């Protein structure tokens, strides 16, 4: 009778043991795989992070967030150790923020050549893009004209050279496109003003 009981327990116990062992192995694999992916994400450079952005599906939703993303790309261009190939990719990313009208007068090759010259000049002069800020969301001006929606706001950025730190203020004009995305129509230098930041 004892032999029958042991055989029955072994028959019932073996599948339970195999199920538990399988769960432990699957859990261990999942844990190791997740940690490897987390490590890979943590080791990305700012350039890699920016270039991995999917603006077709995750476009900035407000005029301020578009301008801040533009500033983030500029800071990457002028502070990161990048190649000319990465510079071109970053310039192409910037152009995804541009209105069709601005793209028409700034085709990629022209815009890239201009950015390349400026980037090389920054490097030669040891100019550092020290930081940037944009107006508070509550300071963004919006209006409608000829059925289109427009917005404007000021972005401040500072440049550091051997001579000291200089401040630049640019007023950005944006327009909503057919997909309801705010696109940069242009920008111009403006006079220093009190910038209200968040």
Specify the residue positions occupied by each region the protein language model found.
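Amphipathic, hydrophobic N-terminal targeting peptides for secretion and organelle import
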Residues: 1-48
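Short beta-strand edge/turn micro-motifs at domain boundaries
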Residues: 4, 37-41, 165-198
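Short low-complexity stretches enriched in small and charged residues
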Residues: 24-30, 50, 104-111, 126-132, ...
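Core segments of small alpha/beta cavity-forming domains
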Residues: 46-124
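A generic structural signal for short coil/turn motifs at secondary-structure boundaries
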Residues: 80, 161-162
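A mature extracytoplasmic/lumenal domain signature
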Residues: 109, 136, 155-159, 172, ...
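Surface-exposed, charged secondary-structure patches
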Residues: 113-161
